[in-house]
């Protein structure tokens, strides 16, 4: 536990100290910044804000985790577990970096195409499975204490889990501070689970990432001076999926990650309903004012009859939902 605190403090300090230099470098080089969605007019003022800040907190958390673990953890199995989780973080970080690079430096608005991104994500998921999951012999899902054997189909579950939550966190990263603190809440919850399980190696990694994210949040809260970019959001989603697998608590991510699930579901429902109504009535209709869900809240709150919500209101609401969901999981696991 002491080492986790040390890792968190070091990561926070390095991340918070380094981020201003990253922002300044971005501005001095006059690198093109984040593009904004025109349908949310209050976001247009953010155009040009430095992005790819995830590069900094990922490098910090990875370096601190490895350094502290190498000097403190002598168990080869524990080091392998940490390296396994870090590998998927790095792989998905590279995918996100490539996507951001094409958008910002090559002026390709779409970045990677959907097919290219999915292919790279699946390749990264396969590497994670065959190098770190398969050798452990895990082939079942823990559901409320019961083992659901999947056999070879566990491979497809891992791919679905990692790719799905990677993209879900990416969708969540749409307003200042939302994704960074939502992930901190999720990581704190998994930190408690790791502590109860005496998985101190995983706890160390969680602590380092929490510290790095909080350092990043000092510059990502409204009004944001920097965004994490795909390099950060894709890696964080993959990390949460990998941690849930490592702790054998896969099902909990559906509740702990309720915000990401809600954001993704809103997009899927909106697209499906629009296509269905266009085919049936000749015109597409919408369930939400705009998706992902945080934009729906921005444009009229929950009811849609009141005033538009500020980003702080949306943040507070969704952070609250995530916190309550996380407390529910801990209560299910350790109280009821």
Swiss-Prot record:
Pathway: Cell wall biogenesis; peptidoglycan biosynthesis. PANTHER family: PHOSPHO-N-ACETYLMURAMOYL-PENTAPEPTIDE-TRANSFERASE (PTHR22926), PHOSPHO-N-ACETYLMURAMOYL-PENTAPEPTIDE-TRANSFERASE HOMOLOG (PTHR22926:SF5). The lineage of its organism: Bacteria, Bacillati, Bacillota, Bacilli, Lactobacillales. Belongs to the glycosyltransferase 4 family. MraY subfamily. This is Phospho-N-acetylmuramoyl-pentapeptide-transferase. One of its GO terms (biological process) is cell division. One of its GO terms (cellular component) is plasma membrane. It holds the Pfam family MraY_sig1. The gene is mraY. Keywords: Cell cycle, Cell division, Cell membrane, Cell shape, Cell wall biogenesis/degradation, Magnesium, Membrane, Metal-binding, Peptidoglycan synthesis, Transferase, Transmembrane, Transmembrane helix. One of its GO terms (molecular function) is metal ion binding. InterPro entries: Glycosyl_transferase_4 (IPR000715), PNAcMuramoyl-5peptid_Trfase (IPR003524), PNAcMuramoyl-5peptid_Trfase_CS (IPR018480). Its cofactor is Mg(2+). It is found in: Cell membrane. The chain crosses the membrane at residues 3-23, 53-73, 78-98, 118-138, 143-163, 174-194, 200-220, 226-246, 251-271, 316-336.
